[in-house]
Amino acid sequence: LTIGLSTLAKYMGGLANLTLIVADQRQYVNNCIMIAAAVVNAAAVVLLTQLKTQLLWVKLGSSLIFAVRPLLYRLYVKKHYPLPKAGKTSAVLDQKWTGIGQHIAYFLHMNTDIVLLTLFADVKLVAVYAVYSMVIGSVRAITESFSSGMEAKFGELIAKERLDRLRRDFWRYQTLIVSVSVVLFSCTGALIVPFVRLYTKGITDADYIQPVFALILLMAEAVNCMMLPCSGLPAAANRFRQTRWGAYGEAAINIILSCALIHWSPLIGVALGTLTATVFRSVYYMAYSGRHILHIPLSKLLVQFAAAAALLGVLAAAGCRLLQGIAIDNYFQWVLWGLATLSAVGAPTAFYCWKRLREAKYETDSDRE
């Protein structure tokens, strides 16, 4: 209860207000509140720890600090948005059940691997999966931060029917997200096994060195990140009902394929199920967004997606293979190799991204069918 207090406060009192703030392209408000809460929380934890306070009270203090965030969101919304009270009407949230269904499908997709490994494989493999998932999930969170405010921007342009500007901004976001994904995930592919080797040093309950599994799971998350602009367009256009089968199909494919492959190879099996399901959803959203929102050929989206995915896979596999023959004995060496890898991949990718962003404004006319 103590640990979950801040999350409870977020969903019970702050999520609607935060959604409104983000939709108005004021993500900086949330960032400022998050930074302030993190600083105050760090100071409070240090102070309570120095006072030798029990762990329960330390966690309670931390949760109470983060529980204040919804109140700040509420105060900001109340001051800047004079919202009238909505009467009873069926037009309000008319697609709420479809939205809930997609969230349930997403929840099933995200948790299928852990559940199946727990039920049908050695429980020790859950620990292996959790370590790799922790690292890759952190990289995914960093990548997703670059799409902040994207859906709100798309929604504004769709509402104003500014198709040319929507295409241009879509290609800019797509170029940025794909470039960031290629850099971060290819570096992660090269460095994740050496990191796990250091992180689990001295732990012998399971074999934590699983490079093939790591690359497959990494590709699944990378594909998911690269498709953020395409998956964000239907949400911005309020097309939840029209795209529901993409979410439902993703969950179904993941569950069915993972169940079929888990007896062949538990870790690789569930990772392949996740990757296949993610690719299906990505292609589905590319097809829908290209045809019904952007009005551009699917082939144009598929070519960029396939090229980026292939490049990422080659870089990650090559980096992983290269570092396998190098002894990395401590975190300092790992950081040095990480910086070298980031420089080698990041510099040319940054140049490509910069060049494409400059050219994007001239591609509007060529994107038409």
Model-derived regions: residue spans:
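Hydrophobic alpha-helical transmembrane segments
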Residues: N31-K79, A91, Q95, Q102, ...
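Transmembrane alpha-helical segments of multi-pass transport proteins
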Residues: T2, E250, K300-E359
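Alpha-helical transmembrane segments of polytopic membrane transporters and translocases
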Residues: L5-S6, D113-I114, A127-F146, W171-S179, ...
